[in-house]
Amino acid sequence: MAVRKLKPTSPGRRFQTVSDFEEITRSTPEKSLVIGLTKKSGRNNNGRVTSRRRGGGHKRLYRIIDFRRDKAGIPAKVAHIEYDPNRTARIALLHYADGEKRYILAPVGIRQGDMILSGEGADIKPGNALPMSRIPVGTNLHNIELQPGRGGQFCRAAGTYAQLVAKEGKYALLRLPSGEVRKVLAACCATVGQVGNVNHENISLGKAGRARWLGNRPKVRGVAMNPIDHPLGGGEGRSSGGRHPVSPWGMPTKGYKTRDRKKASSKLIIKRRGQK
């Protein structure tokens, strides 16, 4: 994938960059693997905002992705590489030897016509999924499970990967994209390789409207609000807020650590992100 820079025919296009989509081989999704997607606009079942700055955006169909990779021992052929509006990564449509079709995240280096395999006997090549107990130390991984059979939860965004740095008993040690090193059960499955669409981080939206197409709404600063709306609001003229940065509910933010010290998974974290 390469990034294409647009001609500056308007202020909105001057700094706008787009993907060239050269890896895409089909524009319409597999009908049996899509479902309708209802917009939530950041609201929960009570209708209250639980995730601010969401709403609008283009209508989407949800592509059902196989994060479990539990079809062990059955080879599959990569039929197509497709665009997915619901994520930054590309997706690959697999045609299994028994006739089933599934979508997976498309890793770097995968091409139309390649053969993919899941299970303990799979080779160490991009796109194959197997338990980390069977993967050599130093391998780059994505779509990593936290519990066996739960499905991949780590490293699913475009260009991300974790590195298998060691094995200790029933645990595998992973270095995550954040720099955190943590233990994960070696029985958990992971997919070999790095998630594709690596140049996604170099995309510049160029204008506010393009963010709205994605369903992102404006972010209003607390100091620009009224006192009723935010602890930093109010004051005569422009002000700094008069206190350390906080959320609208008074929780310290911008660097303040809010992780629960008694969280059970803390004992599995060898090195926190940001630590030297």
UniProtKB/Swiss-Prot annotation:
It comes from the Bacteria. Residues 222-276 are annotated as: Disordered. Gene3D superfamilies: 2.30.30.30, Nucleic acid-binding proteins, Ribosomal protein L2, domain 3. GO terms for biological process: cytoplasmic translation. One of its GO terms (cellular component) is large ribosomal subunit. PROSITE patterns: RIBOSOMAL_L2 (PS00467). It holds the Pfam family Ribosomal_L2_C. Residues 259-276 have a biased composition (Basic residues). Keywords: Ribonucleoprotein, Ribosomal protein, RNA-binding, rRNA-binding. GO terms for molecular function: rRNA binding; structural constituent of ribosome; transferase activity. Transmembrane segments: none annotated. The keyword Transcription regulation does not apply. Part of the 50S ribosomal subunit. Forms a bridge to the 30S subunit in the 70S ribosome. Belongs to the universal ribosomal protein uL2 family. One of the primary rRNA binding proteins. Required for association of the 30S and 50S subunits to form the 70S ribosome, for tRNA binding and peptide bond formation. It has been suggested to have peptidyltransferase activity; this is somewhat controversial. Makes several contacts with the 16S rRNA in the 70S ribosome. This is Large ribosomal subunit protein uL2. It comes from Nitratidesulfovibrio vulgaris (strain ATCC 29579 / DSM 644 / CCUG 34227 / NCIMB 8303 / VKM B-1760 / Hildenborough). The lineage of its organism: Bacteria, Pseudomonadati, Thermodesulfobacteriota, Desulfovibrionia, Desulfovibrionales.
